[in-house]
Amino acid sequence: MSAPNARTTNWAGNVTFGSPRVHRPRTLDELRRVVRDSPRIRALGSGHSFNLVADSDADLVRLDGLPAEAEIDPEGRTVTVTAGTRYAELVTALHGRGFALANLASLPHISVAGSCATGTHGSGDGQRCLSAAVRAVQLLGPDGDLGWLSRDADPEVLPGAVVALGALGVVTRLSLEIEPAFTMTQRVRVGVALDEVADHVDDVFGAAYSVSLFTDWLGEGSVWLKQRTDRPEGAWRGGRPASGPVHPVPGMPPEPSTEQMGVVGPWHERLPHFRPELEPSAGRELQSEFYVPREAAGAAFTALRGIGHLLAPALYVAEVRTVRADDLWLSPAHGRDCVTFHFTWLPDPRAVAPVLAAVEERLLPLGARPHWGKLTAMDPADITARYERAADFERLTHALDPGGKFRNAFTDALFPRG
């Protein structure tokens, strides 16, 4: 099934995709025919990217029309899901069987395949990005053939095929690591001085299983502490406890936020910031994010504090999180623990552009890598130069997609072919 004359936009509305041909197959065989017959095609996720990573000038395909499946292997501790499944659907199925994922992103509304393709993450000193949970991927190749790559059978290749920006084929299924379900609490501390966080990064971000700092970079922020009930809490207690539930964006009603105030609840109702049944975040917005090496966190705090007067007027809110290193070739956390600096901008590209340039001027010399699905003004060659395995990934694209069916202008700029 296709919509030949409909222009598709992303969730934020800042991107209108270039192709009017958007396919939404209902069966795997239909998807295979669409891919086989298309000259160039890109798969769309849930539309929560803010750039042209998923765009195409030929064909687009949505996978959310395929039957959602979640096949749990209790002994192997994996769940195999169809690519268009959203985390909100997956976590309910897992929890009902007594299992969990190690971590979740801020939004449960996002698709599993799209999140893994771009290196989406949550927070936690011991937690890797969501993509690092992938044990195997099923890829639909340019000729419509299906094949699996796995950690066990293809240990040298799979790390290059997970955070792959859709450039290797259409991911149809993924197998993810799971663990026994657990319970958590969520507490928020407000009035936290940014200088205190900068001086005690390890204490603050080690205070709970998952920790986020929200701020406008003018002097104070709120720290969200998401703690497993089966793990000891850290000692840090800066600021003061919030007097009631809050939203990450100051002044917005707290109802979309997951339950706080230390109430014990299941993992999937505490790890995200937002409830799946309500509108996430601020609505219309722009986003950027940069992964800075953990050892440069203090310098990054100092640099951003120095331009707080520029940042605050352009922001809904900024968020700081931590991510553990992984081995995925194009993961922004490849080979190094990171502190991530996220910016939820007002939906005004002209106002945001000079402020984003000021952020990059300060963070890029610290070794920052941008999020693949968010806004950056970086030169594509500068981005790929920050990845030690970029050349290996380019060779993998040649091997799996020699004709370039799954490429687009975004990947062509990053990995040009002669």
Residues covered by each model-derived region:
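Structural signature of FAD isoalloxazine-binding scaffolds in flavoprotein oxidoreductases
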Residues: N51-E71, G122-G144, V170-E177, V339
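Glycine-rich N-terminal segment of FAD-binding domains in flavoprotein oxidoreductases
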Residues: G13-H109, G119-G124, L213, V320
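Non-transmembrane, aqueous-exposed alpha-helical and coiled segments at domain scale
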Residues: T92-H95, G141, G147, P332-H334, ...
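Activity-critical C-terminal alpha-helical subdomain
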Residues: L366-G418
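C-terminal substrate-binding/cap subdomain adjacent to the FAD-binding core in PCMH-type
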Residues: R135-A314, T322
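Solvent-exposed alpha-helices and their adjacent loops that cap or buttress functional pockets
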Residues: N14-V15, V35, L52-A54, E71-P74, ...
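Substrate-recognition/cap regions that form aromatic- and gly/pro-loop-enriched pockets
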Residues: L271-R386
